[in-house]
Amino acid sequence: MGKKRKVTLLDFAFTDKEPRPIPRIPYYWMTDEELQSIHKFPYMNGERCPFEFSVRVGEEVYKFNGVIPKGFPWNVADIPFLLQPISYDKHSPFVVQGSLIHDYLLSRKRVLYNDWEMEAKGITPLEFKRITSEIFGYVLRYNGVPYRKAWLMAKFVDLFQYFIPTWYSLNVKEFDLG
């Protein structure tokens, strides 16, 4: 029996500017569709944010980079009701950056997975989802969340993705992600 190959996140960083979340404000003249979009995605990214991260696959290390576009909408974080008492408020500055990069990577999964040639590097789609959860936890720790709480929140995100795997792809249809 061969050795099991392990996929591990090594590091993550915003390389130029950090995200600047801007609340999307509903106005009386907006259409019902625009108001529903704001209700679903109450924030948008106010800065163009380049990022990079490294992943170890077995013995190989791969670097990936991308850019979160200015104006990218996201819902901050869906924290199930029962888990809210042991996690941060979804609008907490500790959570916002991590949820942005996580939601961006998942919304672009099909494109990024192919652009970054992840399959050729031996990373499966399920491992890519797990990497996005690890990045979420990594950014939480970077922003000062204690290790155990960040780990726990990242595990919640991972479980949520496992049970509702298509959530983000079903909800981000109105924003042209290129």
Regions found by a protein language model. Name each.
Residues G2-G178:
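Extended terminal accessory/targeting regions
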